[in-house]
Amino acid sequence: MGETIASKEMHEYFDELEARLKKAIEIANTARARGGDPKPVVEIPLAKDLADRVENLIGVEGVAAKIRVLEEKMSREECALEIGRQVAEGEVGNFATKKDAVEAAIRVSMAVITEGVVAAPIEGINKVELGKNDDGSEYIRIFYSGPIRSAGGTAQALSVLVGDYVRRGIGIDRYKPRPEEVERYVEEIVLYKRVASLQYMPSEDEIRLIVKNCPVCIDGDPTEEAEVEGHRNLERIGTNRIRGGMCLVLAEGLALKAPKVKKHVNKLNMDGWDWLDILIGGAKTGGDEEDEKKNKIKPKDKYIRDLIAGRPVFSHPSRPGGFRLRYGRSRNTSFAAAGINPSTMVLLDDFITNGTQLKVERPGKAAAMSAVDSIEGPTVRLYSGDLVRIDDIKEAYELRSQVEVIVDIGEILINYGDFLENNHPLMPSPYVFEWWRYDYEAACSEIIPEDELKDPSSALALRLAEEYDVPLHPKFTYLWHDINRTEFEALRKFVVGRGNFSVEDEILRLPLKACIENGVKLILEKLLVLHRVKADTILIKEALPFILCLGLDCHLKEKAPMPDTDNMVNATAFLSGFKVLPRAPSRIGARMGRPEKANLRKMSPAAQVLFPIGNAGGLTRNLVSASNYSVSMNGKIGEIEVEMGIRECPACGKETYFWRCDCGEYTRPKLFCPRCKIEVRNSETCPKCGRKPTSVSNVKLDFRSIYKRAFENVGEREKMDLIKGVKRLMNGQMTPEPLEKGILRAKHDVYIFKDGTVRYDMSDIPLTHVRADEIGITAAKLRELGYVEDIYGNPLERDDQIVCLKVQDLVISYDGGGYMLRTAQYVDDLLVKYYGVEPYYNAKTIQDLVGVLLIGLAPHTSAGVLGRLIGFTRASVGYAHPFFHASKRRNCDGDEDCVMLLMDGILNFSRAYLPEKRGGKMDAPLVLTTRIDPKEVDKEAHNIDLPARYPLEFYRATQEIKNPTELEGIMDLVSSRLGTPEQYEHFMFTHDTSDIAAGPLNSSYKTLGSMIDKMEAQLSLANKIRAVDAPDVAERVLKSHFLPDLLGNLRSFSRQRMRCIKCGAKFRRPPLTGACPKCGGNVVLTVHEGAVRKYLEISKEIGKRYGVSSYTQQRIELLDKDICSLFENHRVKQLGISDFMSGSAR
C-alpha cells in the first residue's frame, strides 16, 4: 500500500487507531483460544486499502499487489478490466481449469469496481460456466443472482464487459443466441417487472438488441416463484422460473448504463460493441431533459406517483409555497442530505426530523433531512390574520397551535455537489444574502457591521440600492414573480386608494375587510409581505421598499406608469428605479419517505444466542422453557429433538455437537451419507451412491444438562425468565454458539444478528464539523481525542468552538449509547466469566464509552470500517464524516447502517455462523477497513464542495441553467484535493447551524398510533399547506396504497394457509380433525376478516370527503360489494306460520 498522504496530526490519528485495534485483536485472540468459538483466532481480516479488501473478499492470492501497481497508472474501471484479464490468463493466482480462472477474473474485477465493499462479487455471481454454441464453439455463461443488485447498475454492466474482455484473452468465442432464447429474455423481463421492481424498464426491441449482440450470455438462478408461459423448457436455459439476477443486469445494468459502458469500450478499443450506439440513441432524451436544455426547468411529479398513507406531501411539484431552493452546505448536509430550518420541522406537525427521508423532485430522488437554523423557516398565516415568518424553533412551538395556513414552508439547503453528482442542470439561485454581499463589496467600500448587513434597516437597504446601485437587499425583496400583472395592478391601485403610510414609523396601514374582499390580503401572502392585523387594520412595518417597488412615493402617489411587461420582477425594478432580483425562482417538491431510525438490530424473530431448540421453547423460542420441556408426562425433562451437526474429536474420539471438545481439541464434522447412512471419511462424495455427505441429523439432545452446565460455567444463577434461542440453525455445519454467550446477553438485555454480533442501526447523516457542547462532551475531552484547534486555527479551549471532524469519528444517538453500554458490560462479563481474562471496557456510564472503537457496516455489504465514538446526540441518527459513509458505499439520502463495538465484533463474529444460502454473506464484516483513503471511497464523496462561500460566478451561472460540470474548475471540491494532505482537513461550510440535533426528537409518523390516525394527520397537514392539493393527495393515497391493499388482502384471504398456534406449522388446508397433526395444537387462519376490511371504511369516507374521481369511487364501491359478499351471511331466514299470519313475511 502506498503511504497515506496526510498531515502529521492525521498520521498520528491513524496510527493511534491502528495501535488500539492491534491491542484489541491480541486480547481477543487470547480469549478465543480459551473458549468454544469455531476458531481460536479473530476471523475478521484487516485491510488498509482497496487492494487488501479485494484479496480478502475473493481469496485470490497475489491480486492485491497487482492492483496497487495498476492503480498508479489507470482509472478504477480500467484497473478492474486489466486485473480481470491477468487473472484469466494465469498471471495472478493458480486455477485448475479455464472455467475457474474466468470465474475468479470476473469476481475480482467486480470487487475492484465496487471498492471491495459490497457482497455482490461473491453473492451476486453464483457461478460461471462455459456453454456450447450451435457451431460447437464455447461461450461464457455468467449466472447472476438477486444480491447482484447491491453492486449498482454500472458495476453490473461492467461485469459483462469484463466477461467479454477476458474471453478474448483466452480464446473463447462469443455467445450466439437462438431465436427462442431471445424471446425468452423479452418475456422474462416483462414478467419480472410485474412481480418485482426495476429502476429502468427497456423496451422489447432494446432487450432483443442486447441479447442478440451481447458477446457474453447473461444467465441466472431462479429467484421468483413465477414462471414464464411461452418459452418454456429451453435446452440451454435450465429453469422456467424468473431469473432475477439476469433481469437486473440486463435492464438496470446494460440497458440503463449503456453510455458508461460505451465510454470504457472506446477507451479500450474493443470491437463488437457498436450496437451500444443504437441502444443509446434509442433512449431519446425527452420531456424534462429537453426542456432543461432549453433553459426551462419543468416540474417532475415522479416523487409523488406512489404515495403511502401517513407519509405527507409537503409540496406538489415546483409549486409556489413549496421548498425554496437555497444553495450552500452546512456541516450536517451534503452527500445527498439537505437542510431545512427546524421551525419547518415543528410546523409540519413533526413529520420531519433529523434523519427523516424526503422523496424530492430534484436534484436526486431522495434526501435525508438535517436541521439548519441559519436559513429561512416557514411563513404562516395565523388565525388572527397575521402573516409571520418563523425562524426560531421556540417561537414555532409557541405559535404552532395558532397556525391556520402554511403559506410558504421555507428554504431547503442543497449543495452544489449534489447537483454535480446527479448531473442535474443548475436551477436559478434566489437572490440571497451571500450573493447580495458580493454585489455590495464590489460597489461599496463603506464599512458596515456584519449584523447590520445581514439584517439592515429599510433606510440602509434603500440607501445602498440608490447610492451604490446595489440590488435591493433580500430582506426587502418580495416574491414578485409569484403574482401576475393583474394582481400587481390591483395591489398597486388598492395601496394608492386605501393605503395610509406614516413616514415617522414607516408603517403602511391597509383596511383588513377591504383587503380580503378585494383579494389584496391573498396577494400580500403570495408576495410574503409580512404583516400584523390590529384593530381591523393590516400593518406592514418597514414598508417603504415595498411601496417604492409598486412605483409609488412616500405619499402613495404613482411616480411612473406601469411598464408594458408581464415580468413583475422587471416591472418593480423599472418602477422603483433600483435593481430588484428574483427572490425565489426555484421551488422543489417533496414528500415524506422513510422515517428516521435509531434502534437496536434484531433478527426476526429476535434471538440472543444461535442455539437451536426446535419447538421445545414455544413461540418465544425460550431456552428456559426448553430446559423444562417434556414430550409427555413420563418423558425426560429437558430432552429435546433438534436438527444439529454431529461432530467428533480427533484427539479422544468423543462425539459432540460443539466446536470444541471437553478435552480442549477442536472438533470436525462427522460425515455420513444421508441416503445410505454409512460414514464417509476423506471423500467429498459417498463411495456407494455418490451423493454429497452431511453431518446434519435430527438428534435427541439432553438440553437440560447443557443448560445447567452453561450457567455453572459463567457463575450465574438460573433465575432468568427469558433467554431467546432459535428454532433451527442456518449455517452449513449446523453447529451452535456456546450457550454461555446467550445467558450473558440475556442478563444484559442485548440481542444478536445472524453472525453472533450485537448491532445498533441508525440513519446516516453527514457531519464534517462539530462542537463539544452539542455531542455531550467537553473541549477537554476533545483535546484528549486529538483535537487541538478549531477551524479558524485557534487553540481548542471552549466547548462552543467548531472543529473539523476526523474521518473515522462517529456521533451516535443517546439511545444507541445506552445500548452500546449494555453491550460493553456484556462483553466484559463474557471476557471475565467465560474466557477467564481481564475486562476490556470497564464502562459504568455512556461517558465511559467516549473514545472506544466501533465497526461500521452497511446492509448488503461485506466490509466493516473501523471507527471511533466521540459523542452522543439527541437526534435518532448516526453522524459520521461523509468519507466514513462513502467507505461503506452509502450516501445520506435516507440510508441506514449499523455500528457494533469492536471487541464484540472481533470476539463473537465467525463466518461459520453465517447462513448457508444465497445472500448469507451479505451484511457481515468479512473484512475490516482500518484506514479510510479518500481516493478509494465511493466517488460521490469526491463531489462534495468545501468552500466557506460560493463564488459570485456560481450564482450568475445558475441563472443560465448551466450544467454543473462547467463550474468544477471554480469550486473547491474534494476531488481537487485528492492526493494532498488537504483531502482530510481544513474543510469549510457556507451555512452554520446552532445545534445539529435541533427539532423534534422523533417523527410523528413513528409516534402516531394506527394507520388511520396517520392518514388523518397526513390529510390535515395537506389542508394546511398552500403548496399541496389535498384532494389530489387523497386520490393518490387511495389508488396507490389503500385500494391495492384491499385487493391484495382479499386475494390473500382466498388463498391463505392455516397455522398451528402452538408449533407454528402451516397447512394449505385445515386438517380434518381441526387440530395440528404434529403437536395437537389449535389450527387457525393466517388472514382474518379484520385484515381484509381494515382500510375499507376510511377509503369510503375519504373518497366522499375529498370528492375523488368517479372511477376511484366506483372501485371502492365494487370492493365493498366483494368484501360484503364474502363475509356477510345472506342465507334465507327460516320463517314460521305466525310470520305469515302477522304479515311480517312481506
UniProtKB/Swiss-Prot annotation:
This is DNA polymerase II large subunit. NCBIfam families: polC, PRK04023.1. It catalyses: DNA(n) + a 2'-deoxyribonucleoside 5'-triphosphate = DNA(n+1) + diphosphate; Exonucleolytic cleavage in the 3'- to 5'-direction to yield nucleoside 5'-phosphates. It comes from the Archaea. Keywords: DNA replication, DNA-binding, DNA-directed DNA polymerase, Exonuclease, Hydrolase, Multifunctional enzyme, Nuclease, Nucleotidyltransferase, Transferase. InterPro entries: PolC_DP2 (IPR004475), PolC_DP2_cat_dom (IPR056172), PolC_DP2_central_dom (IPR056171), PolC_DP2_N (IPR016033). HAMAP family: DNApol_II_L_arch. The keyword Nucleotidyltransferase applies. The keyword Hydrolase applies. Its EC number is 2.7.7.7, 3.1.11.1. Belongs to the archaeal DNA polymerase II family. Heterodimer of a large subunit and a small subunit. Coiled coil: none annotated. One of its GO terms (molecular function) is DNA-directed DNA polymerase activity. It comes from Methanosarcina barkeri (strain Fusaro / DSM 804). The lineage of its organism: Archaea, Methanobacteriati, Methanobacteriota, Stenosarchaea group, Methanomicrobia. GO terms for biological process: DNA catabolic process; DNA-templated DNA replication. Possesses two activities: a DNA synthesis (polymerase) and an exonucleolytic activity that degrades single-stranded DNA in the 3'- to 5'-direction. Has a template-primer preference which is characteristic of a replicative DNA polymerase.
